[in-house]
Amino acid sequence: MIVAVGHDLIEIERIRRMLLREGPRAQKLFAPCELEYAARLSDPTPSLAARFAAKEAFQKVWPRPHGWRDVWVERERTPDGPFPFTPPVLGFTETIAEEMRERGWVAHLTLTHTKEHASAVVVLEER
């Protein structure tokens, strides 16, 4: 059963300006795995914008506030598959992960971006 759906749409240039303005402080919004993934790309900003949108989308379905680095987007490498990475999934701190397990919830994530916008949808499902 679907518990909640959260969506966020963000302008990539807004994230680019924030990263330039805040410098290293802006990196505190992202988990190390998110920064490592984005650093491999010729332009990391669209990827980081999509991850920012994922955090916002999750906040819209979660019953209380959480920190920026309490939720992150993970993508595992798949060197033998047709694509270099698996589909994105949400990762959580142990506190959030434990509450998800207790409630029987699973989070589904989809990300996309164009030249101008990044978007994320999070669906919480009760199993």
UniProtKB/Swiss-Prot annotation:
Catalytic function, reaction form: apo-[ACP] + CoA = holo-[ACP] + adenosine 3',5'-bisphosphate + H(+)
Record GO terms (molecular function): holo-[acyl-carrier-protein] synthase activity; magnesium ion binding
Keyword terms, alphabetized: Cytoplasm, Fatty acid biosynthesis, Fatty acid metabolism, Lipid biosynthesis, Lipid metabolism, Magnesium, Metal-binding, Transferase
UniProt keyword Transferase, yes or no: yes
Chain residues that bind Mg(2+): 8, 56
Gene3D superfamilies in alphabetical order: 4'-phosphopantetheinyl transferase domain
Enzyme Commission code(s) on record: 2.7.8.7
Alphabetical list of InterPro entries matching this protein: 4-PPantetheinyl_Trfase_dom (IPR008278), 4-PPantetheinyl_Trfase_dom_sf (IPR037143), ACPS (IPR002582), Ppantetheine-prot_Trfase_dom (IPR004568)
Database matches in Pfam families: ACPS
Cofactor(s) essential for the protein: Mg(2+)
GO CC terms in record: cytoplasm
Location of this chain's protein in the cell: Cytoplasm
Enzyme's top EC category: transferase
Principal cellular location given in the protein's record: cytoplasm
GO biological process: fatty acid biosynthetic process
Role of this protein: Transfers the 4'-phosphopantetheine moiety from coenzyme A to a Ser of acyl-carrier-protein.
Family membership noted in the UniProt record: Belongs to the P-Pant transferase superfamily. AcpS family.
Protein name per its UniProtKB record: Holo-[acyl-carrier-protein] synthase
